[in-house]
Each structure stands twice: as C-alpha cells, then as structure tokens.
C-alpha cells in the first residue's frame, strides 16, 4: 500500500492557527460509513446523532508545557521538546542544536537560562536529560516551558494556548500534543450530552511528538510506529462491555481514544476488551479489523499521515478521500485548531482496495 495514495491538495489558507471563539462552535462534517453520504453542520449537531445509552470515550491526558529554550553551557543555542517525563528528575526529549550535546553536557534552560540540567545519555534520536533542581519536573516545565504547538501552527505560543490547547476535562499531565477532537467539547455541551443519557468514559494516552513525524517510507507496511503510553482502566472496560451488551454504540473521541481502545482489545486474552496499562505502537491502516468502536469524532488530518490512514481503515478509503475533497471545497478548517468530523463505521472498509 502506497503512502502517496493518502495525499490530497490542501490550500495553506485552510490550516487553522487559532481555535473558534467558542469550543463547540466549529463546523461538523458527518460521514455515514456504509453509504459514504456527507452532511454539513455544526459541532452541537452531535447531540442529534447520539442515542441515549451510547458511550463516548474521551482521552483525559493533559498537555504539558513541553518546549524549552536555552543553551549548552559551552555556548550553542538549543531547543528541547519533551517526549515523556521519566520520573520527578528526568525527561526523554528531542533536542535541536547546531551540534548535539554529548553525555555529561551541562544545559542552561528557560528564557532566562535559570534552570540547570545535564544531558545524561542518548537513546537513538532521543536524549535523556536530568534536572539539577529541587522541584519536580512538572513544576519546572510549568515555570519555564512553552506550549508545544504543532509545527503547522506557524506562530509562537501565547498565554491563551495554555488553556485553549487543552481539553476542558484534561486530568493527567503527560502529553506533548492535545487530543484535538476533544477540544470541541465545552461544559455546556457535555452537560447536554449527560442530560440526554449519553454515557462517558475516560482513557489516557499521552500523545508524543511522534504524532507529528511524517511517514518517511513509500510503502505503508514499512513504517515503524512511535510508542506512546496508554491506560484503559477497568471502569472503561466495564462501560464498553455494558454498552455493547445493551445494543448501544461505542464512540471514540479522537484517534488517541481509538488507539487506546483497540490496543486494549488486541492485548485482551478472553473478553472483547480488557484493562491495558503500557506502551502501545499500534498502527491502524486499511485492512485493519476494528473490534471496539462503532463511531468516531475526529479532526481533519495531514495528508499522508498515519491518522488519515486510521480514518480510512474505519470509514473506507474512497469515502475518506471523498470527504476530504468535499471539506477542502467547502473551506473547512484543518488540523489541531480546525473543524471536526463524525464518522460511523463502514463494514466494507476491511475489503476495499486502496488507491483504485
């Protein structure tokens, strides 16, 4: 399967650099999986598309201020992007510098270079960094870090991004990118969903910077997926099994919720899905057999990204590419701060030939 089959033309003007003034005020493109039919509306139309007893599964990760600026004590400027927090003293990070720091190198971090750290070891493309500070890592990041806006939002982060680039229900710090489908849910909408009898459950997947890495191979099967930490606790498993038992749908809010639920299903020994705590490298592309989710809320993704492949495996390749073509023609806003889709499962997607 060719990566190029997932390419599409996207005018620069359709990339959203700021969110809508109101979270739930974005547009919603609905794709009916079995028929490919498209419906245009606004995000609050979701209320009419869900039935009492349906289960929404959210990702409650919280974005950390993961981008740090500073310099090596020996001189050169550096930019650090945290991939994950290892413990209260250490991080695993990407480091941009004219010359990569060697183990033992001292780093001066923060806009005022007030934080001292040491590059301890290199792990392939990532650097293990230890802070020489009494405070825990998270406190240091909150003090000196910048919000890690995606590379396609071509502007410096602003104070407002600390809340805007965060879901209203975020709880567990650890992500370096927001689970963006969740950004559209505000408290009034969540309340109306609860009043309608919509069930809610929360997984955790700490989105890594790898989510922005381009696919650098020509053939999809050759791509090596990045690893991210996910948690699917017992209460989520119970909620999923209960929804299935009563004939309701499981609706994933975002591709990270999809990857969490499907990872837990793949690892399950007896039931459809069992609790899961650990790293996942699940790579979902056409031909993948979905086992848990019946519908999906998601944003519009980058051309040739692993996420448009995940959507194609769910909705069908042709349906997905047609929907994206329509979205471009209708001037939908793309990527993290952009508009959303609501997609129901297409059982024919499994047998569809891609690129034909």
Swiss-Prot record:
Q: What is its EC number?
A: 2.4.99.17
Task: Name the predominant localization.
Answer: cytoplasm
Q: Which UniProt keywords apply?
A: Cytoplasm, Queuosine biosynthesis, S-adenosyl-L-methionine, Transferase
Q: Top EC class per UniProt?
A: transferase
Pathway listed for it?
tRNA modification; tRNA-queuosine biosynthesis
Q: Which reaction does it catalyse?
A: 7-aminomethyl-7-carbaguanosine(34) in tRNA + S-adenosyl-L-methionine = epoxyqueuosine(34) in tRNA + adenine + L-methionine + 2 H(+)
GO annotation, cellular component aspect: cytoplasm
Molecular functions per Gene Ontology: S-adenosylmethionine:tRNA ribosyltransferase-isomerase activity
Q: Which GO terms describe its biological process?
A: queuosine biosynthetic process; tRNA wobble guanine modification
InterPro entries, A to Z: QueA, QueA_dom1, QueA_dom2, QueA_sf
Q: Does the keyword section mention Cytoplasm?
A: yes
Its job: Transfers and isomerizes the ribose moiety from AdoMet to the 7-aminomethyl group of 7-deazaguanine (preQ1-tRNA) to give epoxyqueuosine (oQ-tRNA).
Would you identify the family this protein belongs to, as annotated?
A: Belongs to the QueA family.
Instruction: State the name under which the record lists this protein.
Output: S-adenosylmethionine:tRNA ribosyltransferase-isomerase
Tell me the organism: Enterobacter sp. (strain 638)
- Gene behind this chain? queA
């Amino acid at each position: 399967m060719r990566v190029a089959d997932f390419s599409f033309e996207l005018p620069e003007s359709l990339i959203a650099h700021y969110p809508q003034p109101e979270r739930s005020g974005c547009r919603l493109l609905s794709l009916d999986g079995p028929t490919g039919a498209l419906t245009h509306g606004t995000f609050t139309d979701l209320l009419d598309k869900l039935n009492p007893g349906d289960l929404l599964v959210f990702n409650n990760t919280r974005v950390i201020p993961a981008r740090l600026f500073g310099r090596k004590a020996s001189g050169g400027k550096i930019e650090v992007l945290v991939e994950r927090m290892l413990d209260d003293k250490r991080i695993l990070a990407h480091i941009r510098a004219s010359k990569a720091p060697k183990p033992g190198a001292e780093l001066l971090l923060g806009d005022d270079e007030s934080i001292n750290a040491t590059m301890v070891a290199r792990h392939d493309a990532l650097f293990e960094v230890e802070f020489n500070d009494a405070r825990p890592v998270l406190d240091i990041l909150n003090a000196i870090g910048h919000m890690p806006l995606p590379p396609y939002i071509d502007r410096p982060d602003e104070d407002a991004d600390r809340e805007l680039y965060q879901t209203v229900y975020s709880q567990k710090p650890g992500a370096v990118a927001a689970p963006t489908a969740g950004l559209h849910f505000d408290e009034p909408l969540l309340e109306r969903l609860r009043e309608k009898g919509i069930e809610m459950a929360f997984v955790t997947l700490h989105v890594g910077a790898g989510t922005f890495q381009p696919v650098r191979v020509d053939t999809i099967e050759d791509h090596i997926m990045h690893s991210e930490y996910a948690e699917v606790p017992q209460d989520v498993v119970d909620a999923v099994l209960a929804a299935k038992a009563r004939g309701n749908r499981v609706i994933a809010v975002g591709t990270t919720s999809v990857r969490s639920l499907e990872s837990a299903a793949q690892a399950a020994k007896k039931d459809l899905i069992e609790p899961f705590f650990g790293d996942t490298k699940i790579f979902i592309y056409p031909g993948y057999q979905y086992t848990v989710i019946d519908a999906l809320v998601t944003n519009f993704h980058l051309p040739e990204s692993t996420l448009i492949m995940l959507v194609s495996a769910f909705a069908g390749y042709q349906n997905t590419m047609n929907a994206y073509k329509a979205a471009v023609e209708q001037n939908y806003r793309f990527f993290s701060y952009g508009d959303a889709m609501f997609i129901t499962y297409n059982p024919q997607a499994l047998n569809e030939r891609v690129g034909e």
